[in-house]
Amino acid sequence: MAIAHLVENYMVQHGVTYDVVTHAHSRSSMETAQLAHIPGDRLAKSVVLEDDEGFVMAVLPSTCHIRLGRLSKELNRKLRLATENKLPTLFGDCELGAIPPVGLAYGMTTVIDDSLANQPEIYFEAGDHEKLIRMKREEFMALMDHAGHARFAARM
């Protein structure tokens, strides 16, 4: 599978520079970091949340878990994990479990954990289980220019 179409188009529209990194098939973000030989703190993962107002994508390092209560309070919403059966409809150009953390490309409210701003480069799923996008922190932040920022991640 190629890069997810909506993500690729979004990156082109934003004029960001990136590389594609290929790795063996993986089943989790931590396994992806190991197989791609990259620090897990530099691999951004997405967690799709929902409430009565709609969907929110939380973006955080693969070495962390989301503090849902903290993010809900920050956004003044009653967020919960989105049910997995809704994801194929929302992300039709991606494989399940390999959703790129670029919710903005899908018209989704997106919030980035502040800890990602400390990394010199960011990697993220391209839409399948065998490719990553790699870009400098500045490029990633330019790509995510309309995303919110908060502290909601806790190391595992």
Write out the residue ranges for each language-model feature:
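Extended, low-hydrophobicity, polar/charged segments
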Residues: 1-156
